[in-house]
Amino acid sequence: MREGIHPAYAPVVFRDRAANHAFLTRSTMTSEKTVEWTDGHTYPVVDVEISNVSHPFYTGTARVLDTAGRVERFERRYGKGS
């Protein structure tokens, strides 16, 4: 790889404030804020609004919004799937 054209790739802590969960990974993102991780090292921390811990799809709390009865109409026409 050519020198000087690639962004810095380093360990970063991503923190989901809604779920009170944090995870350490590598990223090109950085931050002025830092946090001390469980291994005793200090890493930049990036606060995110939603992650796999708090997203409804991954937590199993997702709901199908059916405003016009389309799911019921489909099930009446073609029957329920097995």
Curated annotation (Swiss-Prot):
GO terms for biological process: translation. The keyword Ribosomal protein applies. It comes from the Bacteria. Keywords: Ribonucleoprotein, Ribosomal protein. GO terms for cellular component: ribonucleoprotein complex; ribosome. One of its GO terms (molecular function) is structural constituent of ribosome. InterPro entries: Ribosomal_bL28/bL31-like_sf, Ribosomal_bL31, Ribosomal_bL31_B, Ribosomal_bL31_sf. Belongs to the bacterial ribosomal protein bL31 family. Type B subfamily. Part of the 50S ribosomal subunit. This is Large ribosomal subunit protein bL31B-2.
